[in-house]
Regions:
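PLP-dependent aminotransferase class I/II
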Residues: 13-17, 28, 50, 86-298
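Active-site phosphate-binding strand-loop segment of PLP-dependent enzymes
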Residues: 2-94, 98-101, 275
Length: 298
């Protein structure tokens, strides 16, 4: 109802972000606002996810995806845009101008991948963890910016030049290779997410039934009931697990507006949502340990 009241002749569109939405939520929203306003789907972290057998990012007027290093389809960099209207799509393609992806940027990407692979190897991480503890304790921003780029985001006044860079052959080959693994990787993440759901007590967290392909499950998201995500992160860090403590920052704060009336949910999300890892380096034994620690947050 609040959104409907906000829509007027000056409204360009509305962006919907799939965090822990279900197919039911998605279909209700689309049926309610279709043809009332342009709908843009933020499916950045949900490539391959479906609602009623239709891919997220292709349900509304526009959709966009991210194929960055940590996404479920990794091409090292870049993403994709979906445009439903064929005429608008043809116009966009005819006007779009591409620039070659700089070689130095490609080298930097490959070096970043190698560094991440090295430091987050399970064996190396046992030693690297002590360094991370120091980074968090001393708040060494140079390192934290690499771990949590979203917390130190620079808001651009103009479209960055990199938005015009085309894929090069390395990104194409990496994308093709990873595209073949999207389904099997998803099933592995889903199994791990379901294990978290089974092991974590309802007393300490709200959990979501998001196992029906309507979420790509890059992480398993819970809402903490009795503590906040910063305290939960600190406790798990003591036990050897660096769990991402912040999912999304509250952009409302950037405007210097401390009125929480219209944005209660965003304040709640920023402090209470906790993202549990389901990547390849996390074993079932790790999940059991993490869940046992979380169950102490009573």
């Amino acid at each position: 109802e609040k959104l409907e009241k906000k829509i007027d002749n000056n409204s360009a569109g509305v962006i919907i972000t799939y965090l822990y939405s279900t197919s039911n939520h998605i279909e209700k929203f689309l049926s309610r606002f279709k043809n009332k306003i342009t709908i843009i789907e933020d499916a950045a972290i949900n490539f391959g996810a479906k609602s009623n057998n239709k891919y997220l990012g292709t349900l509304a007027d526009y959709g966009f995806f991210s194929f960055n290093v940590v996404k479920n389809l990794n091409t090292l960099n870049g993403g994709a845009i979906y445009i439903k209207d064929n005429q608008l799509f043809d116009e966009y393609v005819s006007e779009k101008k591409y620039e070659k992806f700089p070689i130095i940027n490609t080298i930097n990407l490959l070096l970043t991948i190698l560094i991440l692979k090295f430091f987050f190897n399970n064996f190396v991480y046992q030693f690297f963890h002590y360094f991370l503890v120091l980074v968090y304790k001393k708040k060494i921003n140079f390192i934290l910016k690499k771990i949590y780029p979203i917390l130190y985001h620079n808001y651009e006044r103009m479209i960055p030049k990199s938005y015009s860079y085309d894929f090069n052959w390395i990104m194409n080959d990496v994308g093709v290779y990873n595209l073949k693994k999207v389904k099997t990787d998803y099933l592995d993440r889903r199994d791990k997410a379901m294990l978290y759901s089974q092991l974590i007590s309802d007393q300490v967290a709200t959990k979501f039934d998001c196992f029906s392909e309507d979420n790509a499950l890059l992480e398993y998201t819970i809402v903490l009931k009795n503590t906040d995500n910063q305290k939960a992160h600190a406790k798990l860090m003591e036990e050897g697990y660096d769990i991402r403590h912040t999912w999304y920052i509250n952009n409302h704060l950037i405007d210097g507006n401390d009125d929480k009336t219209n944005f209660k949910d965003t304040y709640f999300v920023e402090t209470k949502i906790f993202c549990l890892p389901v990547h390849k380096n996390i074993s079932k034994k790790d999940i059991q340990k993490i869940s046992n620690i979380i169950n102490t947050f009573i």
